[in-house]
Regions:
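Residue-level detector of alpha-helical secondary structure
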Residues: 30, 73, 234, 250, ...
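Intrinsically disordered, low-complexity eukaryotic regions enriched in glycine, serine
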Residues: 29-32, 60, 81-88, 256, ...
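Short secondary-structure junctions
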Residues: 33-42, 68-88, 154-163, 169
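Conserved catalytic core of two-metal-ion nucleotidyltransferases
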Residues: 73-122
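Helical scaffold of the NTase/Pol beta-like nucleotidyltransferase catalytic core
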Residues: 1-42
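Active-site nucleotide-donor binding segment shared across nucleotidyl transfer reactions
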Residues: 26-66
Length: 291
């Protein structure tokens, strides 16, 4: 077995797994590891016919991770392993059905990433709606929540530093490890005491919120169901927020680089940058000269 970090977080020789193969594969691993895996899968696993990989949340103390790694290494199903912030493995698919194929090549092996942390919270944070519930992947849902957090109940000081940042901001943050967190953000001072760096310092000012119902209440939504997808979030803010706040959130969401790369949802109007024709440029230049 190799034990190194592969570039891009991807193990060699792995491919998609069919939905019917997920349970027997995880069953076999559960017997070896002695931990619940099936109830702690993250994202869209099991919600569509094929999954590119499997992410599993594992409740394990930091000091017990080496022991978990040894158990994983000992499994005959695990052919390769790499460690970073997660434990990445190449696992033999149990009951592999070669007749089931998809757009990406299938190899009989799937990547399973073991992610140490709080399974309950990670299932909330990494939640991905089913294909019947949303046209968009879970990343859109998370980016929408993060955009709401950046703007809802944001309190900025009138005083600003030289680069235009407020001296102090109170805001929500959507944290993959801590939950929904209320923080006080200040510009990070330079070590020499002369001004500030481009970084910020976030100090938690309230206890983190991890319960979905409490998160929905803090974000002034209706119920935890509103957190399900991009569509449910958009409908909830349109129902509960002032129109100017809705417009700001949707405009900021549409400008996000990841959203633009994947494709801005059809129900958000996108302002295309205005382009000047050569004739317009020449006319404007003449007007400038005549001033």
């Amino acid at each position: 077995m190799t034990n190194k970090l592969f570039e891009g977080g991807s193990m060699p020789g792995v491919g998609p797994i069919h939905i019917n193969e997920i349970e027997p594969t995880l069953d076999a691993l559960e017997k070896v590891l002695g931990i619940n895996l099936k109830d702690n899968v993250l994202g869209s696993v099991g919600k569509k016919e094929f999954s590119g990989d499997i992410d599993v949340a594992v409740q394990v103390a930091p000091e017990d991770i080496p022991q978990l790694v040894k158990k994983i290494e000992a499994s005959p199903l695990v052919l390769d392993m790499a460690k970073s912030s997660v434990i990445m493995t190449k696992v033999k698919i149990v009951d592999y059905d070669q007749s089931k194929q998809t757009t990406k090549p299938r190899t009989g092996f799937v990547q399973i990433d073991f992610m140490p942390g709080d399974p309950g919270w990670m299932k909330t944070y990494y939640h991905s709606p089913s294909q019947e519930e949303s046209k968009y992947k879970g990343v859109f849902r998370n980016l929408m929540i993060a955009t709401i957090c950046a703007m809802l109940d944001r309190k900025s000081s009138e005083e600003k530093i030289d680069d235009g940042r407020p001296v102090e901001v109170e805001r929500w943050m959507w944290s993959p490890s801590d939950g929904l967190v209320r923080v006080k953000r200040t510009p990070a001072p330079r070590k020499d005491g002369k001004g500030f760096t481009k970084k910020n310092v976030d100090v938690r000012i309230q206890e983190p919120i991890k319960d979905p119902s409490a998160i929905a209440k803090a974000l002034k939504l209706n119920t935890a169901k509103d957190l399900n997808s991009y569509e449910s979030l958009k409908a909830a803010i349109e129902q509960n927020y002032p129109q100017d706040m809705v417009d700001k959130i949707l405009a900021s969401f549409a400008k996000n680089g990841t959203v633009r790369d994947i494709g801005v949802p059809d129900d958000i109007p996108v302002e295309e940058p205005k382009t000047e024709s050569l004739a317009d440029k020449q006319l404007n230049r003449i007007k400038e000269l005549l001033k």
